Amino acid sequence: MSFLVVVPEFLTSAAADVENIGSTLRAANAAAAASTTALAAAGADEVSAAVAALFARFGQEYQAVSAQASAFHQQFVQTLNSASGSYAAAEATIASQLQTAQHDLLGAVNAPTETLLGRPLIGDGAPGTATSPNGGAGGLLYGNGGNGYSATASGVGGGAGGSAGLIGNGGAGGAGGPNAPGGAGGNGGWLLGNGGIGGPGGASSIPGMSGGAGGTGGAAGLLGWGANGGAGGLGDGVGVDRGTGGAGGRGGLLYGGYGVSGPGGDGRTVPLEIIHVTEPTVHANVNGGPTSTILVDTGSAGLVVSPEDVGGILGVLHMGLPTGLSISGYSGGLYYIFATYTTTVDFGNGIVTAPTAVNVVLLSIPTSPFAISTYFSALLADPTTTPFEAYFGAVGVDGVLGVGPNAVGPGPSIPTMALPGDLNQGVLIDAPAGELVFGPNPLPAPNVEVVGSPITTLYVKIDGGTPIPVPSIIDSGGVTGTIPSYVIGSGTLPANTNIEVYTSPGGDRLYAFNTNDYRPTVISSGLMNTGFLPFRFQPVYIDYSPSGIGTTVFDHPA
């Protein structure tokens, strides 16, 4: 048995081509008819007349044959067109029947799960609508989530994208209406599929106000890529920031990249939260892991986190082989062994580093009474807690971001120096405004500068006495700080004593305190540690130049 495959579009095209050929031939025959059917005799004699008549008859016979061929050609073209129409009609009928059969088959397959679970077994989720803005879930076995509805009314957020089942991609989040947030992207399939991108926030319609926040990007399951967060909505007015960018979605647990945060704010500023009075923190995403609370520490250089902050053991494996292995510690009584990996750090609002060094703690050992007691207390509540997690968890911190260019370590580099463009020039710690700003120094002049960050020389007055030069560390993560005993002339902190700190013997005063209100720890030797106090009431900018030394810039010296 033979099979014939016909493409109606090709038949229609062929019929048109054949018709064009026929038209060309008819035109040529018509042009030649006059000169071939009525020839003039070459002379007045009988022979010339007979020859002319003979050739004229040939022309007339050719025209008769051409007319018959033209009629056949027209019939052939009509047959082609008729066949094309017949095949097209048959194809449409079959397609309709197949669609009906497919619909009926899917209906039969999906009916049990829709009845029991409210979602199909196979098929894409429906897109969101004005009355039901969230996209529908994809089929439990196969199917993409529906896209969220993009709102147009003021104050109405975008719909969330639907999530996939076993295999499929998450739906995109819908755009927010004016002054409203975008919808979250749907999650990709549990086995395979990508997350849906977060919806953009709506633009502000209120003068001087930022737009809506971007939606969170959808996460992947085992295999797939997490999606980027949605962009924050545009602000209303010149110089007005966008809304906050949405967070990126987690990548596949076994394979796949992670999404990054959407553009937001002014593209260089993130919130700075002060916890427990002395701990300046930001929220960052390392290696696409969970959002972590990170201490901003001018007293060290390099980012130190636990495995949980990079996505657990699977996150560690995603980063590949470490580039180094070393040991470091904190003065509060904690030593740790860490491996250095290369990955990105996402501070939010689209502020993401290039691949940079990140230190992941493999083993930690408490050595001080505080660190030991804190660890055992945490261990009773959670047997999986490590000494590192307990040490910083006591103050609500997950890791430490060292930003001091001439700090001792742990290194090997400062992640904020891997930010793109001019964002890598320095960082402003603005505790009064609750902001961390990346890039060139935004502080208005005049400012007071101290060469070195964090290690420099400061001058200390005790109750208005002669300034004493003291090697110091300007340490935002130093809590209440330390002071050498030789500076105060005692091994214990005297009560009701006024202590002032200056840039030079006759220079500007940077900060001051009374020992009844602020009590640094007295040490027998070593550097004076300012603790957080200089940062508490004034913005302080850490300039990464000169290279390897840095400059500390105070906006409003006390």
From Swiss-Prot:
Transmembrane segment boundaries: none
SUPFAM superfamilies: PE/PPE dimer-like (SSF140459)
Domain of life from the UniProt record: Bacteria
Localisation per UniProt entry: Secreted; Cell surface
GO MF, one example: aspartic-type endopeptidase activity
Lipid biosynthesis listed as a keyword: no
GO cellular component term, pick one: cell surface
GO biological process: proteolysis
Record's keyword terms, sorted: Aspartyl protease, Hydrolase, Protease, Secreted
InterPro entries per UniProt: PE-PGRS_N, PecA_C, Peptidase_aspartic_dom_sf, PGRS_rpt
Modifications after synthesis and translation: Undergoes auto-proteolytic processing.
Active site annotation, chain numbering: D297
Domain PE: 1-93
Role this protein plays: Aspartic protease that processes the lipase LipY and other PE_PGRS proteins. Can also cleave itself.
Family under the similarity heading: Belongs to the mycobacterial PE family. PGRS subfamily.
Protein name: PE cleavage protein A
Organism (species): Mycobacterium tuberculosis (strain CDC 1551 / Oshkosh)
